[in-house]
Amino acid sequence: MALKFHVLHQSKKSRARVGRIETAHGIIDTPAFVPVATNGALKGVVDHSNIQLMFCNTYHLLVHPGTEAIAAMGGLHKFIHRNSPIITDSGGFQIFSLAYGSVAEEIKSCGKKKGSSSILEVTDEGVWFKSYRDGSKLFLSPEVSVQAQKDLGADIIIPLDELLPFHSDTTYFLSSCARTYVWEKRSLDYHKKDPRHQSMYGVIHGGIDPKQRKIGCAFVEDHPFDGFAIGGSLGRNLNEMVPIVDITTSYLSKDRPVHLLGIGDLPSIQATIGFGIDSFDSSYPTKAARHGLILSSQGPIKIANQAYTNDLSPIDPECTCLTCTSKISRAYLRHLFKVHEPNASIWASIHNLHYMQEFMKNIREQILHDRI
């Protein structure tokens, strides 16, 4: 079945809302944080049963083991033994970010083009690129991307789009926006021929140009997408991103869920939740964990700091995650990081992911009480 979206409460203080998305593989309470499982696995975490929605990257799974191989094994849910909802991207983001830099390098897309680009050619038909594994030449079109996502069998899928760096000139930027919407229409048409249980979100581009964002919103509104995803360049920092997300969401109808692509750090969530964003995806908590940055109710903890050398207190006294209930102390976790013990990032990742889920639960409570 295609997803069903219900708004359970609209805040009286802002455009924030509490909702519920129903999919063939389960319920997603919104607003939701969606962790990224690049290759079908959350880095440093084995158990993802408490994660309602997980984001997997089509590009990486297309390169290895291959989406057709996954389809032959019964689809991604069966392959990774997951019974809850999955969202996949088109593969376009990875192709372009490997050439220009990642979301985090700009907030979204102001990285300079890398000297040795993986992109070989972008045409109206699609994009030719080199595999990051063996350098082989691969082609991704709207139809190829959607078929790959159908092979994977994700609950929510994304049409192919072109991600440009912040510094792109105006002429190419406008032609890219136009090409992206043609690609999205082709993606949607291909999806509608065999929708199965899947839903497709339309991606809104336009960079930091309010006029182009309005055009993008009109495009996705005028087509039967099941939800909306805010994509493209969102500026060089949080101050530039916030007004763009604000104006973009103001153009959208309230009957479909809204996802903010590639953004999910705490400051960004806090700054944009009031605009009616229903889900955020990011590798932020697991990446932070691998670098020894621990999220806590008392603020971020840089566990390598010498201050924690003899600190036997729990990482977060208010936390109920496996790490904290196992009495892992700050001193012990610091020791594990200092000696490069793999368990260090595992304990930290378990904690950070749990913290994000509890953080979003608290946000939903605040919206229900009209505090946000």
Swiss-Prot record:
Single GO biological process annotation from the record: queuosine biosynthetic process
| Note on cofactor | Binds 1 zinc ion per subunit.
Active-site residues, Swiss-Prot/TrEMBL: 89, 281
Residue spans making up a coiled coil are none
- To which pathway does this protein belong? tRNA modification; tRNA-queuosine biosynthesis
Tell me which EC number(s) this protein carries.
2.4.2.29
- InterPro entries from the entry? TGT, TGT-like_sf, tRNA_ribo_trans-like
Q: Which UniProt keywords apply?
A: Glycosyltransferase, Metal-binding, Queuosine biosynthesis, Transferase, tRNA processing, Zinc
> What chemistry does it catalyse, as a reaction equation?
7-aminomethyl-7-carbaguanine + guanosine(34) in tRNA = 7-aminomethyl-7-carbaguanosine(34) in tRNA + guanine
Give the cofactors, semicolon-separated.
Answer: Zn(2+)
Pfam families documented for this protein:
TGT (PF01702)
Region of interest: RNA binding: 262-268, 286-290
GO terms, molecular function: metal ion binding; tRNA-guanosine(34) queuine transglycosylase activity
Q: Which residues take part in binding Zn(2+)?
A: 319, 321, 324, 351
State the family named in the UniProt similarity comment for this chain: Belongs to the queuine tRNA-ribosyltransferase family.
Q: What's its job?
A: Catalyzes the base-exchange of a guanine (G) residue with the queuine precursor 7-aminomethyl-7-deazaguanine (PreQ1) at position 34 (anticodon wobble position) in tRNAs with GU(N) anticodons (tRNA-Asp, -Asn, -His and -Tyr). Catalysis occurs through a double-displacement mechanism. The nucleophile active site attacks the C1' of nucleotide 34 to detach the guanine base from the RNA, forming a covalent enzyme-RNA intermediate. The proton acceptor active site deprotonates the incoming PreQ1, allowing a nucleophilic attack on the C1' of the ribose to form the product.
Subunit-structure text: Homodimer. Within each dimer, one monomer is responsible for RNA recognition and catalysis, while the other monomer binds to the replacement base PreQ1.
Q: What is this protein called?
A: Queuine tRNA-ribosyltransferase
